[in-house]
Amino acid sequence: MKYYSTNKQAPIASLQEAVVKGLAADKGLFMPMSIKSLPQEFYDTIDTLSFQEIAYRVADAFFGEDIPAETLKQIVYDTLSFDVPLVKVSENIYSLELFHGPTLAFKDVGGRFMARLLGYFIKKEGQKNVNVLVATSGDTGSAVANGFLGVEGIHVYVLYPKGKVSEIQEKQFTTLGQNITALEVDGTFDDCQALVKSAFMDKELNEHLSLTSANSINVARFLPQAFYYFYAYAQLKRAGKADNAVVCVPSGNFGNITAGLFGKKMGLPVKRFIAANNRNDIFYQYLQTGKYSPRPSIATIANAMDVGDPSNFARVLDLYGGSHAAISAEISGTTYTDEQIRETVKETWKDHHYLLDPHGACGYRALMDGLQSGETGVFLETAHPAKFLETVEGIIGEAVEIPAKLQEFMKGEKKSLPMSKDFADFKKYLLAL
């Protein structure tokens, strides 16, 4: 499969080039030349298949031409060493729990898959010393760092905004050591992302170092996220609830919903999507006005969605041929304040004894507000509520149980290097490696 850039000014790339480069030479995002529809018999029998079997079929459609079947199967099965259960919260609304992986967030799927795929390519080429740069507002850093931990020939640099990441999130990537280095940037998530993008565009840096990205701009990070949309449908089908499925995705950088939209293009029977925003409602405003107006991000209690210029919007636009009408026909938007998010967490805990994290709360509320009669709603519960301990405990007025996996991270010692948001300083640091 070949990949083209959303900006249409860069040469066509192979899967390996797209994964290793991360970003195209014209600063665009890579897109596969074609999206294969999966046969009807797959959908007819999907409820009889395991998560790994479903994921392998989806992965084969994207990556089968480039990776030997046995290798791909091993990558998929290794990646998905945990379940993603669909849990009923209230009448016709289900939570797709994406927090059962090693770092208790949805990004474990993309992070683990990408680490294994990149590891395969590096081994194949006999390469050494590949540097992965990743900007994080919280969960990406931990998922990518833990996915790549101990992978030979790769060193990961996690850039995160000082004081803007919860202690639990921070501990998940600052305590690992080995081939993981945490850089504490004096700025916002957007500043961290700008440093990473500038590094890729810098000719001198790229002559000295082999650089790649693990943000959702990388095709190996966001495409595997399609796996769990198919698995959600399989679980709905088992429950006899697969007709008129509506999927709501709490949205920040838009990699997650883009993967779902790819699933729909492959024939996945989802009636429509809802993108739930916090106060960073850039996409919501686009749906209303047809104009995309990025602006600086605002800090909210759903911090992983505090993105003022979502990278993957370019992919959504490309997928629908730039048509606002086509996009708004399949995706609607909602936007919620911190107050509304708090209210939702509190009421859902009180009424259904189901504990939401602030991001999942946006998803659940959007379905409560927007589900029509005869529809079944699925929202993506993207991280375990204990990852936002102070916020969630403050809302419900009770102690939240911390899962054993998280407790292990909390015991580690934080090690990070301070970094300014000035690219010249970051470049100097990288050149000295």
Where are these regions (language model features)?
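PLP-dependent amino-acid enzyme catalytic core
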Residues: 1-433
